[in-house]
A protein has these predicted regions:
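Short pre-active-site segment immediately N-terminal to the catalytic Zn-binding motif
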Residues: 190-209, 242-244
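Auxiliary, metal-adjacent structural segments of Zn-dependent hydrolase domains
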Residues: 123-183
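Active-site recognition of the HExxH zinc-binding catalytic motif
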Residues: 132, 181, 208-223, 252-253
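Post-HExxH zinc-binding segment in Zn-dependent metallohydrolases
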Residues: 236-264
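N-terminal export and membrane-targeting signals
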Residues: 1-11
Length: 327
């Protein structure tokens, strides 16, 4: 989830509007349900700067420290730096062979236990580091680990409250490249918003959502997010801005699918659990009456499966896909 885009009144100061999707009523349900969100991303306040402020005002966990890998100064014998393509359709990120397998056993933690779920989120984040750092650095893209602020209830970070009122979603804040999440909100819900546990209590679903958030970090590092945001600012219509948002979010979902495939053998994601993930992504997406900013449940399922089954970044190029697949 990206926090701070107000599509009705697009602002240069990004007040926190959490973009939500929905839990679609199944045929066996006889009552309507409240939206269940799929995560999104918050655009940077300035595309060329990363503010140094730390998230939190004492109510949230401090973000887990990041480890950076500074670029070495070029020497006489070093290879010239690559010229990176930061466009949406031909980004340098797309020229890779996919994510390598990673040893990432999850264990049997419960999504309803804060300590267990937080531990699993941070453990699997290290697995995401391993596969994405190699993929990015192989393309000449500078990588650093995102920060994490995981609470049991609510907190406040550099992009505002998390989760926001009436929301359950984790989000990525590019102002300090930190991922924020409330374990209780994600698992059990908040207010009228149902938790992911209403769909499945298997922890792999929430970890796949955190992989979506990491996908936003990948978009940030590769220049995709800045290019997307510039095009959003230049778009002259609400429908145009929403169309860009859907492609952006569905791409992050595809990247999340890539990670789950990379970890599948060790996590493990059995064929039955794979089907659980497919079912999960067929139940989240844009809900009637809410902004069409994340894509339909059918297309969320489509792009998660695309990432999981193809495991190639160019296969996640939503910017070249037909509009029918990003609606």
């Amino acid at each position: 989830m990206v926090v701070g885009v107000v599509f009705g009144l697009l602002a240069l100061t990004f007040t926190g509007l959490v973009l939500v999707g929905a839990l679609i009523k199944s045929s066996r349900d006889s009552v309507s349900v409240s939206p269940v969100a799929i995560p999104t991303f918050t655009p940077p306040e300035r595309s060329t700067e990363r503010p140094t402020e730390r998230p939190g005002d004492g109510r949230s966990d401090e973000p887990e420290p990041r480890t950076s890998q500074p670029s070495a100064e070029p020497s006489e014998n070093s290879q010239p730096r690559r010229t990176l393509n930061t466009s949406l359709k031909n980004n340098s990120l797309y020229a890779n062979r996919g994510l390598p397998r990673v040893n990432c056993p999850a264990g049997s933690g419960s999504i309803y236990n804060h300590s267990q779920l937080k531990s699993l989120i941070l453990k699997t984040s290290r697995c995401m580091d391993k596969v994405w750092s190699k993929t990015l650095q192989d393309r000449g893209i500078t990588w650093h680990r995102p920060g994490y602020a995981i609470t049991s209830r609510r907190g406040r970070g550099a992009c505002g409250d998390f989760p926001q009122t009436g929301s359950i979603v984790p989000y990525y804040c590019p102002r300090n490249t930190t991922i924020y999440a409330s374990t209780t909100a994600m698992a059990r819900g908040s207010g009228n918003a149902l938790g992911y546990g209403q769909i499945t209590d298997w922890h792999g679903a929430i970890i796949s959502m955190m992989a979506h958030e990491y996908g936003h970090h990948v978009q940030q590092l590769s220049g995709l997010s800045n290019t997307w945001w510039q095009q959003t600012l230049e778009s002259g219509s609400r429908s145009g801005k929403l169309a860009l948002s859907r492609r952006f979010e569905l791409q992050a979902t595809c990247f999340g699918g890539m990670f789950m495939r990379a970890a599948a053998a060790s996590y493990p994601v059995t064929p039955a659990r794979r089907n659980t993930l497919y079912y999960f992504y067929s139940r989240v997406g844009d809900h009637p009456g809410w902004p069409r900013d994340h894509g339909s449940p059918a297309n969320n399922n489509r792009w998660f499966r695309q990432g999981y089954e193809k495991n190639k970044t160019f296969q996640c190029n939503t910017w070249l896909a037909p509009s029918s697949t990003t609606s």
